[in-house]
């Protein structure tokens, strides 16, 4: 049973349910847990409606087809800003405020009683009768010496109940010297612990105006003053003083003056000096016989007895209860199952609650949690304030407490006391009678539950929190208290911090020692919440053996997957950067338990919980991260074979976690102090494991999720750190001219033009010396010119001897050369290194800025420097964001090789000299190559554009590796609320319902409208100010917004009703530009803007219409590789909301299908053509259907749901010209398409019935540049480079022609570059090469 269900079943009044497994973001309306099945259901419903439009079911299915329910890219991972993702080298560890800096103990208690029985002090006039009881002894009931001794013993016993382990010293009617010896002895014994000094001055005068207290001379004939300064010098700190005498505040004032507590710079010793005083300066102690003479001491040391006696006289029960019965309350104070024990328990809960609610949390922790005896005294001090104020006496403390005597929790205490007293006569009369427990705790838990139902972070915190803590001590209330505590902790990190501050930690830590099955689930949940806030608790857990509790839970058969995921999270935190935790969990077979669960996840098994898989991987990764023994055990347990299949899981979080686990299984590299020869003999099994791991990681280097690719980059950085030399060899091998053909997909860092300074930053490097067959290695150093003209001059250097090592100017690993052989550590296949270098360069030009930054960092690890692009000048204008959307990236130009043939420049520099690649694995007979260096003045130039070397010669090289983010990011899931209903999504659902209603109304209008003519005069005309004209545009379905982009991938958003620019930003900062298409994703919800570039890069933005607030949701490269001989990819894409698929193709032999819900390439469909794809159109009502137009004028229809996806192929266009536009016709017909050729003809086809066209429109005589087909209305539009737009009906009737802008001079429109219809209204947006975007509508529309 799930945790939420468990709570509900146990307490039906607690409406709690657990959120579905890996759905992190409540902002999404529908669950994505079963996207494929939902997709199939949606498609089935839409398919079933063909030919049956009369039934209600068909109408529903039709609306489902037109209004797809699929929502993508709205998980928690898409809310994380690119800029906020950590790339640093160290984590910021926050010191938890709830944890006490140090616990303290009162080690010694000095009791000084100055009673001088039978002699009243001269300044006291006693009433008759007056209070006489001291320590519950009547001093006149026995001989004075005996009475004094008995009182001293009683007082000592009363204190011992609160701190039995302290040493107690009593001085009765002492002299100054005796007090001095007592104090010095106590301090000597206590050492650094606290000393308590209790002073009873009932037999001496009240303190002097200077705060001196009185003691006796040896003969008891005089009162001797004792200065507070001397007392303070003997006891020192830490200390606590109790002064039970009249005018006791005089003493506090003297301490304050002594320590200068009033000044802001007072010493820290004042914090370690605590004082409790019985009354204020002008007050005398109560003399009423209602109270004992030492009422203050009685409150502090015997609170239950004192409280009941005081209450009894004020209760309605006073007539029927004999006060003497209070001394006979059955039970023990420390046994909560007895009446006395329960009363003490309730009293503790009440006073803790009062203190918690009135004191600052720091002061509460200091007084009520740091020292057991101090906590007890301050709880009892609250009672003293209540009782003594009724006698016009005001107890005082330092630190000063606010008034608490009228706090409403005292009413709850009075009720508990009354229930107790009402049972007392019967319990005393018949000891076998069972007492009825007080409903106090049940009622307080109910009050806490009411708060949980209505409270929040922004309301007053629940005052019952300290009571919940107390209830954990009771078996009968424990389960309910834990469930309610779990609900509270789930409200957020603020709630966890509050609970920890109140002192919950030691209680839940001790509960891990219980074996009660009922508590396991909720304890795991509570510890999940605690560790999500504060990982420092890992130390306490390992110290107390708590890790075994969670390993047993993880291995148990009864737990649900989401509960096991929490246990795996707890264990991951325990081993995170904590060697003792790693060792303890390794000994407890955590690796075996985790791998056992991964192995159990076979295809025949039920679909495993993604969150559980994710945390199993993260737990393993953290267990063997930088822990060689665990890595060895992981390899021996075939961890790779069990982790590798997870790289194809549909959830990006699982894939990223699996990459993390595999990456941390890689050894980071040998110690630079370790002998290279020793490293040569590494275990072959380790080499094979590394080889397998790297090959598996290279398979996901092009994953659709930045979360996954970031982990691949981090893993490759770890690999690069241990294999720097071999990767440099692989990089150097590509410098050979004959190797350039292998690099068709690798980028080059060419000269980058900075428009701001009109300078060119370029790197000039000399050619690489070819490896020679000469048996004797020879090396020459060559230096090269840094002339801005690019002329390279060779400077002869001194030759290096055979056995000299290559020096690294940045402290990289040295080659070890002896006898002509270079020893290389852990050698893998050369092809693996080559593939790694290609992968690193692919990452360095990643569409995601964060991944690109990581990729450049990996390249820096192997010594490859980069040219950094300077930020271009802001091109914004008033009303739009003038800054670029993210940090400028390195200028990684995409070209066919690393050579920049102009001026003979090589684009890369190695900080350490690259070596020619070996011909065999035994690297003998290598010729050393030239050392390539820059001139010092170039390196020192601020405008050189060179990145600083990442790795220096110091021992901190390893700390400079980029950090993984998946673990820290995943931890955030458990910081968020995991329990609760769907209230948060109701508002979102209402907004969607409103949009659906609007869409259905307008779809019906479009379908049943008769459009006679399109108005030549636009309703809006927008000068985009694009320098290269508008390349593509789209109209927002629910707002008067048009989004346009130019060839330089500058995006601008315009409100055409208000004629205002809303936002403008650059899609990216790479030098190569080219836009392919704009699409809207999730248009019925919070829409996202998909921007596809000509090179196949896809970037998806949120908040795109808000000035300066645009945020990159995700980015990936939709196409890998292109056809031989093709210079550019010329990517074309289309988005299908119904299936959640993005289709992409271009100068490539396949059409790739990306599932944006999984962020994964799910299929590559062969295009079945030698020509490149020039147009793509996905059906918006039939998921999986796709039409493609080719460069030779041919068309193909695919159904990607079928094993044989090609449905049919035809060539409707007579001339061999590329297909410019292609679209499915409006309606639910699955195979009617419209195709437009560059030659100017538009063909209408029904590909399911015949491959021939049933209608041809010769729209333009050549130069057709754009086609738009309305999604629902029977209208199409075409545009020409010859500056005109034509509009037609689906029957071929021309509805309009547009040639001129509406101006006095009748200026012709520009060469048409793009056309797009509004999806639900008859609006046409047209973009042209002259930077104008115009919006047209039809003249009249009437219902048929």
From Swiss-Prot:
Tissue: Expressed in roots, leaves, flowers and seeds.
BP-aspect Gene Ontology terms: embryo development ending in seed dormancy; maintenance of shoot apical meristem identity; negative regulation of autophagy; TOR signaling
Entry keywords, A to Z: Cytoplasm, Developmental protein, Growth regulation, Repeat, WD repeat
Family matches, as PROSITE patterns: WD_REPEATS_REGION
Entries under Gene3D superfamilies matching the protein: Leucine-rich Repeat Variant, YVTN repeat-like/Quinoprotein amine dehydrogenase
InterPro entries documented for this protein: ARM-like, ARM-type_fold, Raptor, Raptor_N, WD40/YVTN_repeat-like_dom_sf, WD40_repeat_dom_sf, WD40_rpt
WD repeats: 1025-1064, 1070-1111, 1125-1164, 1168-1208, 1214-1255, 1259-1298, 1307-1344
Cellular component GO terms, alphabetical: Cul4-RING E3 ubiquitin ligase complex; cytoplasm; TORC1 complex
Subcellular location: Cytoplasm
Residue numbers spanned by region Disordered: 28-56, 771-818
Modification after translation (UniProt): Phosphorylated by KIN10.
Superkingdom to which the source organism belongs: Eukaryota
Biased composition (Basic and acidic residues): 28-44
Observed phenotype of the null mutant: Embryonic lethality when homozygous. Embryo development arrested at very early stage (early pre-globular stage), leading to aborted shrunken seeds. Constitutive autophagy.
Regions of compositional bias (Low complexity) in chain numbering: 785-816
GO molecular function, a single term: kinase binding
Membership in a protein family: Belongs to the WD repeat RAPTOR family.
UniProt-recorded name of the protein: Regulatory-associated protein of TOR 1
Organism: Arabidopsis thaliana
Taxonomic lineage from the root: Eukaryota, Viridiplantae, Streptophyta, Embryophyta, Tracheophyta
């Amino acid at each position: 049973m799930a945790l939420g269900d468990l709570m509900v079943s146990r307490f039906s009044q607690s409406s709690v349910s657990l959120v579905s497994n890996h759905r992190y973001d409540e902002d999404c309306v529908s669950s994505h847990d079963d996207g494929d099945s939902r997709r199939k259901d949606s498609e089935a419903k839409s398919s079933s409606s063909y030919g049956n439009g009369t039934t209600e079911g068909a109408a529903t299915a039709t609306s489902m087809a037109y209004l797809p329910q699929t929502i993508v890219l709205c998980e928690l991972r898409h809310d994380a800003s690119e800029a906020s993702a950590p790339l640093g080298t160290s984590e910021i560890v926050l010191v938890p405020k709830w944890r006490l800096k140090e616990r303290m103990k009162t080690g010694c208690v000095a009791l000084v009683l100055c009673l001088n029985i039978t002699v009243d002090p001269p300044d006291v006039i006693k009433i008759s009768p007056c209070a006489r009881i001291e320590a519950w002894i009547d001093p006149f009931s026995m001989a004075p010496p005996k009475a004094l001794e008995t009182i001293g013993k009683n007082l000592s016993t009363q204190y011992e109940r609160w701190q039995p382990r302290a040493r107690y010293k009593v001085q009765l009617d002492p002299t100054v010297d005796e007090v001095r010896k007592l104090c010095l002895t106590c301090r000597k014994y206590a050492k650094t612990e606290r000393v308590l000094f209790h002073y009873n001055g009932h037999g001496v005068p009240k303190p002097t105006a200077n705060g001196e207290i009185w003691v006796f001379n040896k003969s008891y004939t005089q009162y001797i003053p004792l200065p507070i300064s001397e007392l303070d010098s003997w006891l020192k700190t830490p200390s606590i003083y109790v002064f039970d005498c009249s005018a006791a505040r005089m003493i506090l004032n003297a301490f304050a003056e002594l320590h200068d507590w009033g000044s802001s710079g007072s010493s820290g010793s004042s914090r370690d000096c605590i004082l409790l005083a019985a009354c204020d300066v002008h007050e005398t102690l109560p003399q009423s016989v209602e109270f004992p003479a030492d009422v203050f001491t009685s409150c502090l040391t015997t609170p239950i007895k004192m409280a009941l006696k005081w209450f009894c006289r004020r209760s309605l029960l006073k007539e029927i209860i004999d006060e003497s019965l209070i001394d006979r309350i059955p039970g023990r104070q420390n046994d909560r199952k007895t009446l006395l024990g329960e009363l003490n328990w309730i009293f503790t809960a009440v006073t803790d609650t009062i203190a918690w609610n009135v004191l600052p949390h720091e002061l509460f922790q200091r007084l009520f949690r740091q020292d057991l005896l101090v906590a007890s005294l301050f709880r009892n001090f609250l009672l003293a304030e209540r009782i003594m104020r009724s006698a016009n006496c005001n107890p005082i403390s330092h630190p000063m407490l606010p008034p608490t005597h009228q706090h409403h929790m005292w009413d709850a205490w009075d009720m508990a006391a009354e229930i107790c007293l009402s049972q007392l006569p019967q319990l005393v009369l018949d000891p076998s009678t069972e007492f009825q427990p007080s409903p106090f705790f049940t009622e307080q838990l109910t009050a806490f539950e009411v708060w949980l139902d209505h409270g929040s972070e922004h309301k007053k915190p629940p005052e019952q929190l300290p009571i919940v803590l107390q209830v954990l001590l009771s078996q009968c209330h424990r389960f309910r208290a834990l469930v309610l505590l779990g609900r509270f902790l789930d409200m957020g990190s603020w709630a966890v911090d509050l609970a920890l501050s109140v002192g919950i930690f030691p209680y839940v830590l001790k509960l891990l020692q219980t074996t009660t099955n009922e508590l396991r689930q909720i304890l795991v949940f509570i510890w999940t919440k605690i560790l999500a806030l504060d990982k420092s608790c890992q130390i306490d857990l390992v110290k107390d053996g708590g890790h075994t509790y969670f390993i047993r839970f993880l291995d148990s058969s009864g737990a649900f997957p989401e509960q096991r995921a929490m246990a795996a999270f707890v264990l991951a935190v325990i081993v995170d950067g904590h060697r003792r935790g790693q060792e303890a969990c390794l000994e407890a077979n955590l690796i075996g338990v985790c791998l056992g669960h991964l192995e159990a996840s076979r295809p025949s098994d039920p679909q495993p919980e993604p969150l559980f898989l994710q945390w199993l991987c993260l737990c393993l990764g953290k267990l063997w991260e930088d822990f060689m023994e665990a890595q060895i055990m992981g390899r021996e347990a075939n961890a790779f074979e069990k982790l590798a299949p997870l790289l194809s899981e549909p959830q990006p979080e699982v894939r990223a976690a699996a990459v993390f686990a595999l990456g941390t299984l890689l050894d980071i590299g040998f110690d630079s102090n370790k002998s290279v020869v020793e490293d040569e003999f590494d275990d072959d099994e380790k080499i094979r494991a590394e080889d397998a791991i790297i090959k598996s990681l290279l398979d996901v280097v092009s994953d659709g999720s930045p979360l996954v690719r970031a982990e691949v980059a981090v893993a490759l950085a770890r690999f690069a750190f241990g294999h720097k030399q071999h990767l440099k060899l692989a990089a150097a091998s590509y410098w050979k001219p004959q190797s350039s053909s292998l690099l068709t997909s690798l980028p080059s860092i060419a000269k980058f033009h900075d428009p701001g300074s009109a300078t060119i930053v370029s790197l000039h490097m000399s050619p690489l010396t070819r490896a020679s067959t000469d048996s004797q290695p020879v090396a020459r150093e060559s230096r090269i010119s840094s002339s801005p003209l690019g002329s390279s001059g060779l400077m002869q250097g001194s030759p290096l001897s055979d056995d000299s090592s290559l020096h690294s100017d940045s402290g990289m690993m040295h080659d070890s050369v002896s006898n002509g052989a270079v020893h290389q550590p852990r050698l893998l296949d050369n092809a693996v290194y080559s593939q790694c270098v290609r992968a690193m360069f692919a990452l360095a030009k990643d569409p995601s800025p964060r991944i690109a930054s990581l990729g450049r960092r990996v390249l820096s690890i192997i010594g490859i420097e980069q040219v950094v692009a300077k930020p271009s000048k802001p091109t914004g204008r008033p009303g739009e964001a003038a800054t670029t959307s993210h940090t400028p990236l390195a200028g990684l130009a995409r070209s066919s090789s690393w050579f920049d043939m102009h001026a003979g420049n090589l684009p890369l520099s190695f900080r350490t000299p690259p070596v020619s690649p070996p011909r065999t694995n035994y690297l003998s007979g290598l010729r050393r190559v030239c050392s390539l260096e820059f001139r010092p003045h170039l390196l020192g130039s601020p405008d050189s554009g060179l990145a600083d070397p990442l790795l220096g010669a110091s021992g901190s090289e390893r700390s400079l590796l980029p950090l993984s983010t998946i673990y820290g990011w995943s931890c955030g899931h458990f910081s968020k609320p995991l329990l609760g209903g769907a209230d948060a999504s109701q508002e979102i659902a209402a907004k969607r319902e409103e949009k659906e209603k609007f869409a259905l109304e307008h779809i019906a209008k479009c379908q049943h409208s008769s459009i006679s003519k399109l108005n030549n005069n636009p309703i809006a005309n927008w000068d985009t100010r694009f320098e290269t004209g508008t390349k593509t545009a789209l109209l927002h379905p629910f707002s008067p917004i048009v989004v346009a982009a130019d060839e330089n991938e500058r995006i601008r958003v315009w409100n055409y009703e208000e004629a205002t620019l809303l936002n403008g930003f650059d899609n990216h900062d790479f030098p190569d530009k080219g836009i392919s298409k704009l699409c809207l994703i999730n248009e019925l919800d919070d829409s996202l803007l998909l921007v596809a570039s000509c090179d196949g890069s896809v970037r998806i933005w949120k908040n795109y219409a808000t000035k300066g607030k645009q945020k990159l949701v995700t980015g990936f490269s939709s196409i890998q590789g292109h056809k031989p001989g093709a210079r550019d990819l010329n990517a074309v894409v289309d988005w299908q909301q119904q299936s959640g698929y993005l289709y992409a193709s271009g100068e490539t032999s396949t059409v790739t299908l990306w599932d944006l819900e999984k962020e994964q390439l799910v299929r590559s469909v062969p295009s079945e053509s030698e020509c490149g794809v020039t147009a793509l159109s996905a059906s918006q009502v039939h998921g999986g259907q796709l039409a493609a137009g080719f460069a030779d004028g041919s068309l193909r229809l695919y159904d990607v749901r079928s094993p044989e996806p090609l449905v049919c192929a035809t060539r409707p266009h007579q001339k061999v010209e590329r297909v410019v536009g292609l679209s499915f016709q409006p309606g639910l017909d699955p195979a009617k398409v419209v195709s437009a050729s560059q030659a100017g003809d538009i063909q209408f086809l029904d590909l399911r019935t015949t491959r021939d066209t049933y209608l041809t429109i010769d729209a333009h005589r050549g130069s057709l540049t754009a086609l738009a087909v309305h999604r629902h209305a029977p209208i199409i539009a075409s545009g020409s480079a010859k500056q005109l737009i034509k509009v037609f009906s689906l029957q071929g009737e021309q509805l309009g022609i547009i040639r001129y802008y509406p101006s006095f001079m009748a200026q012709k429109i520009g060469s048409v570059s793009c056309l797009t219809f509004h999806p639900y209204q008859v609006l046409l947006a047209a973009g042209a090469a002259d930077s104008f975007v115009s919006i047209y509508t039809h003249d009249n529309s009437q219902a048929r």
